[in-house]
Amino acid sequence: MTQQDPAAAAPRPVLVVDFGAQYAQLIARRVREVNLYSEVIPHTMPADEVAAKNPAALILSGGPSSVYADDAPSLHPELLELGVPVFGICYGFQAMTQAMGGTVAKTGLREYGRTELQIQSEAGVLHEGMGESQQVWMSHGDSVSEAPEGFTVTARTEGAPVAAFECPEKRMAGVQYHPEVLHSPKGQEVLRRFLLETAGLEPTWTAGNIAEQLIEQVREQIGDEGRAICGLSGGVDSAVAAALVQRAIGDRLTCVFVDHGLLRAGEREQVEKDFVAATGAKLVTVDEREAFLQKLAGVTEPEAKRKAIGAEFIRSFERAVAGVLADAPEGSSVDFLVQGTLYPDVVESGGGTGTANIKSHHNVGGLPDDVEFELVEPLRLLFKDEVRAVGRELGLPEEIVARQPFPGPGLGIRIIGEVTEDRLETLRAADAIARAELTAAGLDDVIWQCPVVLLADVRSVGVQGDGRTYGHPIVLRPVSSEDAMTADWTRIPFDVLEKISTRITNEVEEVNRVVLDVTSKPPGTIEWE
């Protein structure tokens, strides 16, 4: 299995140098909100490799370490000599200070959480016109006590005598606080000013330009005669990926919808109707429900489930290829497989240097090593909101682009325990009720997604009618998010929760308890498995 490096078709990136920050991906996303392309790289990347990426600017992220710790992440001084704009945040601010001859002190004055930032008389470009003070989010122990030579101190706090500085001549600046988080209300404007005014970058990373670049990239990868096959899951990612490839190579793309039996109620019909109507793409639907259930028989370990589903999905594709080839010119083959892999998928699967593997993602690590296709992943560098924007640019209807995320392995990873037909029917019924009530309450635009999970290996004691019951609990997992990198549990009104619980326990056999998951991400991932 081979893949093309999609970064080759991207514009010059704003590189976020990750020093172990919790919010490194969020920084990249905030940069993209300014319509600039951004990637995250580890602080261990050699300076020559960083230079080879031809960065438009560098942002040095925060991190949990003290610059005085023996194992503190180091900043390669050569990065400050590349001649590109540099912006330091929190730990990156301190590392930048040390590398350029300033002073970082152990003041003993720690600042965590909301802090009042005092703007100096020389406010500089970043804080000009923002008043004498503003609320920011701090998380530091050490503080910069003296700025490097040539830098102007523009802000301070009680615990940080130098909380921000700038050097317009070098196109460098830094802040002790976290401008990327919502708890710093003016932080995004500060970041925007650095990128557009101090760094002088042109904001060209728009939905229209992204779509054009990706279409051209796909044409280049597949060529003038190559043929591709794309698996549709019913979700926005695969639909947008397929629409991009369809725009690039036309009828040389065949979309395959594998009904693996792990779908929610009505999903097969929705794909066959909505997607074909929107794109005019060729669609082949194959019924593989029995094959998937056989592969999942007796499998309870989450990773084993993902691997089994991924492996069988590819085998289903290979069986479908024979039918696709029947309509192809004599002697031709299908060599390319289109996937809707997103940037968070790659990050969670440890796809970047220095990242930990959280779980194998169904679009990244769940494929067999002997897969016979070359992967086409046009969305690999995009966040979910960017995918939706590209989908709208391509003319896909809201029913597709606004659809809540649904994992490729489907309900298979929302059943905690062995996957059986009876358990699927139970979960399908509960899920349909939850979705219907959330829609009726007008919460579709509030909730990022709401996984409904069946604890199939748990028996809960209950009383229904005049008898004692031993049913299964259902877990509701509503979350709010911007890009799935982080998420907070959604505060659904109690009356809506009551309706969902009452209907599920009354209408779904085998369920006698409904519980609410109130865990944010981190520490918990959105899906249970």
Curated annotation (Swiss-Prot):
Please give the InterPro entries that the UniProt record associates with this protein: Class_I_gatase-like, GATASE, GMP_synth_C, GMP_synth_GATase, GMP_synthase, GMPS_ATP_PPase_dom, NAD/GMP_synthase, Rossmann-like_a/b/a_fold
Instruction: Say yes or no: keyword Ligase present.
Output: yes
**Record domain Glutamine amidotransferase type-1: where:** 13-204
- EC number per UniProt: 6.3.5.2
Indicate the segments annotated as coiled coil, or none if absent: none
Q: Please give an example of a GO cellular component term from this record.
A: cytosol
| GO MF annotations in UniProt | ATP binding; GMP synthase activity
Going by the UniProt record, its keywords in alphabetical order are: ATP-binding, Glutamine amidotransferase, GMP biosynthesis, Ligase, Nucleotide-binding, Purine biosynthesis
- According to its UniProt record, which reaction does this protein catalyse? XMP + L-glutamine + ATP + H2O = GMP + L-glutamate + AMP + diphosphate + 2 H(+)
The record lists the organism as: Corynebacterium jeikeium (strain K411)
User: Which Pfam family would be a valid example here?
Assistant: NAD_synthase
Q: Which residues form the GMPS ATP-PPase domain?
A: 205-403
What is its pathway? Answer: Purine metabolism; GMP biosynthesis; GMP from XMP (L-Gln route): step 1/1
Q: Where is the catalytic site?
A: C90, H178, E180
Binding residues for ATP, per the UniProt record? S233, G234, G235, V236, D237, S238, A239
Q: What is this protein called?
A: GMP synthase [glutamine-hydrolyzing]
Give the matching CDD domains: GATase1_GMP_Synthase (cd01742), GMP_synthase_C (cd01997)
Q: What does this protein do?
A: Catalyzes the synthesis of GMP from XMP.
